[in-house]
Structures are given as C-alpha cells and as structure tokens.
Amino acid sequence: MTQTLDTKEDPLNLGGGWASSAPLRTWSFGPRRRRGAPVYRRRPRYGPKAEYEPPRKQAKQQYGPGPWFQPPWRPYWAVYSNWGRWRGPWCPPPAGFRKPPGRVQVIRVYGLHPLCLCCCSCCHGPWNPGWARPPGRKKRWGRRGRGLRRHPRRSAQRSPPVDLSTLLRPVNLYGWRAPGMRAPRNTTQFIMNQIYEDMRQQEKLERQQEALRAQQAQAASTASPEGAFGNDVPPSGGQEDEELQDTLYSFVRNPSLVFSPDPDEEKQTATSQLVEEEEEGEREEEEEEWCDEEECDGKELESQEEDEESEAKDEEDEESEAKDEEEGEEADYMEEREEEDEEDEAEEIAEEEEGLAEDEQTEEENHLPLEMPLSFLVGAEEERENFMNCTYLSPKQGIPKVAQEALFMVQDINC
C-alpha cells in the first residue's frame, strides 16, 4: 500500500495513486471556489430566458439517445472516480484487452449506434457527449457561445407568402420601357412627363370650351336684332364674374392672348374709329364753309405775329433768368469759400494749441529741453577724458568688487 504525500490526490489515503476517490481539479479558468461553498454548474445560457432563469438546484435528468434500456448516466462528479463504469472499484483491464478492436468498438468510435439490445457496454449509448443531445438541438462545432438559430421551444414563425403582383417589376436597364414595368429607369422624368401630359390635356379642354363659348356668343349676336350694339349691353353680375375668371384663366394659360385683343372688340373698335373719322371730316368741312378766304388770311397773319412776339419775349425771359442764376451761383460760391477758410483757420489754431499742450507734457516728463546737449550726462570733463583715453577695460575695472549682500539686495520699489 503506497502512501501519497498529496492529499488532493488521495484524501482518504486509499493508496489508489492517480485514480483516487476525489476527482482531479481541472486547469480551468472558471472561478475558484472555497471549501464548502456550493458548486454552481455552468450551464450553457443563451436564448431569451437566459437572464431570468436561476441555476438549477438539482441536475436535470439527461435525455437518453433512444427508447431502449439504459442505465442512468454517471453524474458529472463521478467521471474520474476509481469506481468503474459498472459499479465496483476500478481495476486495470485484463491482459487480453490489447487485441485489435472488434466491429462493435469500431462502430462506436466512428459514431454509429450499435443495434444490439442486450445490457452490454456497447448498448449504453454513445460515450462522447457530443453524440447524445436533446432533440431539437443541432451541434455546430465552433459556435458554442453564439446562441441557437432557432430557440427549441419556439415554433418556426412562418411568414405569409409574398404577393408578387404588388411588387414593381424589375427595371429594364438596356432597352425601352417593357410593357409590364410600372415605372421607367428615370422615375423623376416619368413623373414630369405625366404632369406635362396632364397640363396639355387641360389646355386642350380649355380651348374646346373657348371655341364653344365663341360659337354660342356668335349665335346669340346673330339672333339679337341690335347687331353690333347688342354686345355693349352689360351682362348680369354672375355671368360677368364667370367671364372675367375665364378670360383671366385663358390669359394665364396662353400668354399670347395677352397681346392679341379679342376679335369682337377688334370689330367694335374698327367701326367706332371709322365713325369718329367721318364726324371730324364733317366738322372741318363746316368750318371751312363758315370762314371766308379773307378772314382766314387775316387770322393767319395775326396768329403769325402773335407767335413771333411771344417767342421774342420767351427768349428775353430766358436770358435774364440765366444771368440771375449765374450771379446767384457766384455769390453762393464766394460765401462757401469764405466759410471754408474760416473753418480751416479755426482747425489750425486748435491743432497748434493741442501741439503746445503736448510739448509741455513731454517737457514735464523728460525735464530736458530738446536743445540741451547730452554731453553732461557722461560726467565731468576729467572723467570724460579718462573714459576716452582708456582703450581696454581691465577685468578689475569692468567687474568691480562688491559685497555679495549688496548684489542680492532688492531696493524698495514703492519709494
């Protein structure tokens, strides 16, 4: 009986070596739990009920692969125990086990279910958990966390069949519009063409109505005994409004009507002009009969003299007015020049006063007039000569010895 030092491998010290009573802790990245804490099995959670479904207290009975007799599956905690597949402690297989596998084992390895109904090991269903799966699930390798395509408890929602007659036919890309197509390639152009076609139909209808109205008016005018003067009678109010609206609408629709007058009006105006010309001719003839030739000549001479006198007077008045205007303009110009000169003088005086005030301010700031030489700033004459004669400054002269405290002293700025 061998003693194992690792209590995890053999907690009861049964001497089982690696196949001890406690299963090995796997190298998983799941949460490590403390001793005595309950184990929450990680069930695959996907679908709509994953957020609300609490973890099960007891493992659900797994589905078997078929209706024949099966011993219950081993629980997940007994997978690695030394109790073998059919109860009893684990023992190594017999020596004759190392023969090539029979047909039943080959079938089991490659995923086919053997069909013998005895209680041997080949009948206990597939050992690979990927083979035994509840109905309604589809195994997809490599898609574990992405959820099912269809939830198992939800029936497939059958969409109603699409009515293809309501859909547009496919667009004909190459030729003209096919007879079955609802719209052409350029739908906007098609809509605009429809609009223009409607407008043309409307104009055609209006023209027909206008022709009908003209025929009715002609029939009415021929039927009435007054003839041309019958048109001058004003119609009643409602008819007048309707006619006004019709004429306005026709002007909007056909702008050429704006510049061409109505044919009935043309006839009326032509007849009225002829009547007026005849009356004027009669008046002139009467005037000529009334006045004799001599009187007419005297009247003509008098009228010529009066015209000449009035022209001479007008010319004199114009000349006098032009002279008065020129004199007035000259006087205004002189007055404007005098006013401008006075304004310029006042501006110059003000600028001079401002300049004097600024000069006084600068003198107060500098305390020095501009004429004073700057030579006195250098110092006395002896010092100046010494300064000019000294070609090179020695380092002792250039950097005088001053106490360190004086160098770092900061004078009071506020004084």
Curated annotation (Swiss-Prot):
Highest taxon above the source species: Eukaryota
GO BP of this protein: sperm DNA condensation; spermatogenesis
Location relative to the cell: Nucleus
Principal localisation: nucleus
Composition-biased stretches (Basic residues): 31-46, 135-156
Entries under InterPro entries matching the protein: CCER1, Coiled-coil_domain
Biased segments, Basic and acidic residues type: 1-11
Biased composition (Acidic residues): 275-363
GO cellular component terms listed in the entry, alphabetical order: nucleus
Keywords for this protein: Coiled coil, Differentiation, Nucleus, Spermatogenesis
Low complexity composition-biased segments: 211-220
Region of interest called Disordered, as start-end residue ranges on this chain: 1-20, 29-64, 133-162, 202-241, 255-372
Regions annotated as coiled coil: 197-224, 264-366
Described function: Regulator of histone epigenetic modifications and chromatin compaction into the sperm head, required for histone-to-protamine (HTP) transition. HTP is a key event in which somatic histones are first replaced by testis-specific histone variants, then transition proteins (TNPs) are incorporated into the spermatid nucleus, and finally protamines (PRMs) replace the TNPs to promote chromatin condensation.
Listed name of the protein: Coiled-coil domain-containing glutamate-rich protein 1
